[in-house]
Amino acid sequence: NAAMYVRADSDIESLEDMEGHSLAFADPNSASGYLVPRFQLQQAGLDIDTYFSRTGFGGGHEQAVIAVLDEQYDAGVTWVSGQGDPAEGYTRGNLRRMVDNGLLDMSDLRIIWTSNLIPNGPWVVRKALPQEAKDIWSGWMENLHETDYECYKQVSQGEGPGFGRVDHSFFENIVAMRQRELEGSR
């Protein structure tokens, strides 16, 4: 998921309160930190260029959080798992990583909006590998959360239900969003 956050001491309580305020996207190449929030906000009827007083890029997910905490922007967007307690930074994602690394106290932020689910980036294998090697790799990844949960948490960067096989169709909506974004910038 993408999550829009503000400082906890902000008067902004919801997306509706964001009208006329500034928004930091994380990175132009990020699905959760730019592409999906921008698309879903537009789908909700918001004109990004006029609804917000200004938008910009924070220079990355962590940097956008810091920019909001330093009052350079009123709100920012970042990636979160959407699972677990928001007050702890969820189970995975940028906020959780910042909390775990001592860079963020979630009591300093408030989540005001979350996107629909966003597929995580894929784990892939070369087509040229022998089928047996592909099956071994895929089986190991699919069972990792059961066979070695601590390893799974390191690989997935947090808690979660495990990995599963998907094909290209699973990512088609992200590809389509990116293509629309590129066409709109021409």
Which residues fall in each region the model found?
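Short beta-strand-to-turn element immediately C-terminal to the catalytic PLP-Schiff-base lysine
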Residues: 5-7, 125-126
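Flexible hinge/capping segments at coil-to-helix
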Residues: 6-27
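Sec/Tat-exported extracytoplasmic proteins
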Residues: 8, 27, 45, 72, ...
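Extracytoplasmic/secreted envelope proteins and their assembly/folding machinery
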Residues: 15, 38, 65, 134, ...
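Pocket-lining segment of extracytoplasmic ligand-binding domains
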Residues: 22-24, 28-130
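An extracytoplasmic/periplasmic, membrane-proximal ligand-sensing/linker region
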Residues: 125-186
